[in-house]
Each structure stands twice: as structure tokens, then as C-alpha cells.
Regions:
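Topology signature of small-to-medium multi-pass alpha-helical membrane proteins
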Residues: 1-138
Length: 138
């Protein structure tokens, strides 16, 4: 179980670093963050990358950083915390692909990372007998 907590700490930290830098780039330059053209947002509800950058920075970046810190401390709630932010990452990727009407290698990679985090979070919950289906049998 200790290996899973360590892996999740590193896993969430790596995702957090990418999201914090990507989100910060979109907040600093919402019209062309890291060279990404505004044309990708055509057909989406956004005129620039300010709001997506804010969501990326706060929810995905800060959220995964929080999850990494709680994994380092082996929080008894880590299964729930990792699950929430892993599912959040997968939802973020799916919504992003729908809005820009494209799928790139990084989308697939981050979706798989989110799925891996969710599976490991569920294994923690199962091991702690805190998986939602186990709560009703107590």
C-alpha cells in the first residue's frame, strides 16, 4: 500500500506541474499561450484561453498538487481525493477534445494518466473497505 501512495504522490505532482505551468501560461497570455493559436477555440464558448487557463491552473493544477501532498502524508481520505482529481482530469480531457474537435497524443496520454490514478484510487478504497459499495454493508 505504501508503494501506491508513493506512486500517487509522484503521479499527481507531475500532473500538477504540467497543469500549473500550462494554466499560468494561459493566464499570462490568454491570446496565444505557448504558441497555441486562438483558432482552436472556434466553435467553443471561449474567445480566449483565460477561463480554460484559470480552470486548468486551479482545479487540475492546484487540485493535483493538493492530492500529491495528501498522498505524501498517506491520508486516510487519499482514495477519495485521488479519485476526484483523476476523474476531473479525464473529464477535462474529454471536454477539451470535444471543444477543439481534435485528439492529440497529449490528450491520450493525460487521459490514460487520469485513468491510472482513478484505478489506483479505487484500489486504495477497496483495500480500506471504503469503496462506496462497501459502505452500505457495514
Amino acid at each position: 500500500m505504501v508503494k501506491i501512495y508513493r506512486f500517487l504522490a509522484i503521479h499527481h505532482f507531475i500532473i500538477a506541474i504540467g497543469a500549473l505551468f500550462g494554466g499560468a501560461a494561459a493566464l499570462i497570455n490568454p491570446y496565444e499561450p505557448l504558441g497555441v493559436p486562438l483558432e482552436l477555440l472556434e466553435g467553443s464558448p471561449f474567445d480566449n484561453y483565460l477561463i480554460p487557463g484559470l480552470i486548468l491552473f486551479t482545479i487540475i493544477g492546484v487540485g493535483n498538487l493538493f492530492s500529491s501532498c495528501t498522498a505524501v502524508k498517506s491520508s486516510k481520505h487519499q482514495g477519495y481525493i485521488s479519485s476526484v482529481f483523476s476523474w476531473g482530469l479525464m473529464i477535462w480531457i474529454v471536454v477539451q477534445c470535444i471543444m477543439i474537435n481534435a485528439i492529440d497524443f497529449l490528450h491520450v496520454l493525460y487521459f490514460i494518466l487520469g485513468l491510472l490514478g482513478a484505478v489506483l484510487a479505487m484500489s486504495i478504497l477497496y483495500e480500506q473497505r471504503a469503496f462506496p459499495t462497501n459502505l452500505f454493508g457495514r
